[in-house]
Amino acid sequence: MNTPAQKKITIVDTTLRDGMSSVSHQFTPQNVADIARGLDRAGVGTIEVAHGIGLGASSIQYGFAAATDPDYVRAAVDAVENADIAALYVPGIATLAELQKAIDAGIKTVRVAVHCTEADCGQQPVEWAKEQGLTVMTFLMMSHKLDPEPLAEQAAKLDSYGADVVYVVDSAGAMVPRHAGDRVAALRQAISADIGFHAHNNLGVGIANALTAAENGATFIDGSLRGLGASAGNAQTEVLAAAFERAGWDTGVDLFPLIDTAEHIVAPLMKEPQIVDETALILGYAGVYSTFFHPTKRAAKKFGVPARDILMELGRRGVIGGQEDMIIDVASELAGRTYEIPASAAV
């Protein structure tokens, strides 16, 4: 039973965006509708829908999706009664034209994601989206790479552009609770916008990180049903709901419909259990972007070198999202041979 003394937290679900990475972006529009309907019935207020990398990412580089982003968005919009549908926009991958298509399909919220040192790359899409009347959430990806104070300086830029929410994003699953709490606390001192936290579970502390982020001032927390997401996956939406309720927070969601949606709709669609295997663990330990998970496994098999060695070297080099081509470079170097592009693939 809710009381006025309860603290409020907003859970945003990303099963239909980050979770796409776990199913090779192959959810169908019907799958999207079924999952969105379940989340809506449970009271989730914002549901993120798109290709796993975001709008406009369906390609040979990131993997082709089973449908277009507008098709996914329309399927979700038609399935819900109360929830807002959101989409992810990554500058350099998406374009404003693609964002307009998502708006036409029915999104009410856009989530603009930039590398944690490059908040200025978000100015154009944030300001443009605000002009279109969208709620704008912003992501500082790979937030573990900056100490709290410089991260807060980047957040202040996004705040100045008009962002409604600024997220600390643990893209690599490299944080432990102290890291999450310190960064959120620094943002709370620096910006007037609301603060969000997006966890990955590579070190097994996604839920703990989310709880600590909330205790330090985050009011928006991302999750995905069954933890579905890149590499080790995200904080699990249904577990977040239960844990926050046990910790005395009002989530505004109904736990049992969340569990039902996770168990009876999402689980049968999963290719494999969302676990912290060796590659996922080392990815978090090395601080490498979560989408490197499957390409690294493929490169390890192709070149006959351990995935852990590839990831540790990538971490040492400080690679970020968008530098997936470095996986082949590192794997070939570790194997002691030069990789040549097949003639059939040459342009």
From Swiss-Prot:
Gene Ontology biological-process entries: catabolic process; L-leucine biosynthetic process
Binding of substrate, residues: 17-18, 171, 198, 289
Manganese listed as a keyword: yes
CDD domains for the chain: DRE_TIM_HOA
Positions annotated to bind Mn(2+): 18, 198, 200
Highest taxon of the lineage: Bacteria
Catalytic reactions of this protein: (S)-4-hydroxy-2-oxopentanoate = acetaldehyde + pyruvate
One function term, GO molecular function aspect: manganese ion binding
Keywords on record: Aromatic hydrocarbons catabolism, Lyase, Manganese, Metal-binding
Domain Pyruvate carboxyltransferase: 9-259
Residues under site feature: Transition state stabilizer: 17
Catalytic activity, EC: 4.1.3.39
Family the UniProt entry places it in: Belongs to the 4-hydroxy-2-oxovalerate aldolase family.
Protein name as it appears in the record: 4-hydroxy-2-oxovalerate aldolase 2
Species this protein is from: Rhodococcus opacus (strain B4)
